[in-house]
């Protein structure tokens, strides 16, 4: 899920190599309210946002060993909101002492014909899902707590069922390359959420 709503970073000129710093965990349904209460106390003094997003994952298979993956996401509860196209690179295998997973991140707002464009480019949809949850902010950190729903009839986002009896929890920061000190702040924040949820540096390859 990578699945939560995405942030937009304005670029005034040139190219900025943005990186996503990420910690992940999960919490059972019956512990959700306790976690939300804790986050309200720790995060910025504003009401958390709620979201209902539809995400489609597209693959482009070529001669390379693994397909090229792009994610198209749209809001189901905010009429007129732009589609988002997101690319997430492979996790960096750098400093073992780095407290968060780090990967390249490209996120752009697009027009509503995004999926048609991707299909014309040769991409094929691999899977789709609906994500429902809450978004909190603490400075530059973003915390999302959300549940993933399976779409039972392709394309029909009204016909879904929960994928599990738990909520995913993600703590992330999007920053220019080289800002590794943010992972220290993330670790310190994650410590304050224990024992309700344990946020960890999880390598997606280990889940495959």
From Swiss-Prot:
Compartmental location: Nucleus
Highest rank taxon of the organism: Eukaryota
Disulfide bonds: none
Segments passing through the bilayer: none
Alphabetized UniProt keyword annotations: Activator, Nucleus, Phosphoprotein, Transcription, Transcription regulation
InterPro entries: Mediator_Med18 (IPR019095)
Principal place of residence: nucleus
GO MF terms, alphabetically ordered: transcription coregulator activity
Database matches in Pfam families: Med18
Modified residues (Phosphoserine): 66
GO CC, one annotated term: core mediator complex
Protein's GO biological process: positive regulation of transcription initiation by RNA polymerase II
Self-association and partners: Component of the Mediator complex, which is composed of MED1, MED4, MED6, MED7, MED8, MED9, MED10, MED11, MED12, MED13, MED13L, MED14, MED15, MED16, MED17, MED18, MED19, MED20, MED21, MED22, MED23, MED24, MED25, MED26, MED27, MED29, MED30, MED31, CCNC, CDK8 and CDC2L6/CDK11. The MED12, MED13, CCNC and CDK8 subunits form a distinct module termed the CDK8 module. Mediator containing the CDK8 module is less active than Mediator lacking this module in supporting transcriptional activation.
Function: Component of the Mediator complex, a coactivator involved in the regulated transcription of nearly all RNA polymerase II-dependent genes. Mediator functions as a bridge to convey information from gene-specific regulatory proteins to the basal RNA polymerase II transcription machinery. Mediator is recruited to promoters by direct interactions with regulatory proteins and serves as a scaffold for the assembly of a functional preinitiation complex with RNA polymerase II and the general transcription factors.
Family: Belongs to the Mediator complex subunit 18 family.
Name assigned to this protein: Mediator of RNA polymerase II transcription subunit 18
């Amino acid at each position: 899920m990578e699945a939560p709503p995405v942030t937009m970073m304005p670029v005034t000129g040139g190219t900025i190599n943005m990186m996503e710093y990420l910690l992940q965990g999960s919490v059972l349904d019956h512990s959700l309210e306790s976690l939300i209460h804790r986050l309200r106390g720790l995060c910025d003094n504003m009401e958390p946002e709620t979201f209902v997003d539809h995400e489609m994952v597209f693959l482009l298979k070529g001669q390379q060993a693994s397909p090229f993956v792009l994610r198209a996401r749209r809001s189901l509860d905010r009429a007129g909101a732009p589609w988002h196209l997101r690319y997430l690179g492979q996790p960096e295998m750098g400093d073992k002492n780095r407290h968060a997973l780090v990967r390249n991140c490209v996120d752009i707002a697009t027009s509503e014909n995004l999926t048609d464009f991707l299909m014309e480019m040769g991409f094929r949809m691999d899977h789709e899902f609906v994500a429902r949850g809450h978004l909190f902010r603490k400075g530059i950190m973003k915390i999302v707590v959300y549940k993933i729903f399976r779409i039972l009839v392709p394309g029909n986002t009204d016909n879904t069922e929960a994928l599990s009896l738990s909520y995913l929890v993600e703590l992330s920061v999007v920053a220019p390359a080289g800002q590794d000190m943010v992972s220290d702040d993330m670790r310190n924040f994650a410590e304050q959420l224990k024992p309700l949820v344990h946020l960890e540096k999880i390598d997606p390859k280990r889940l495959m």
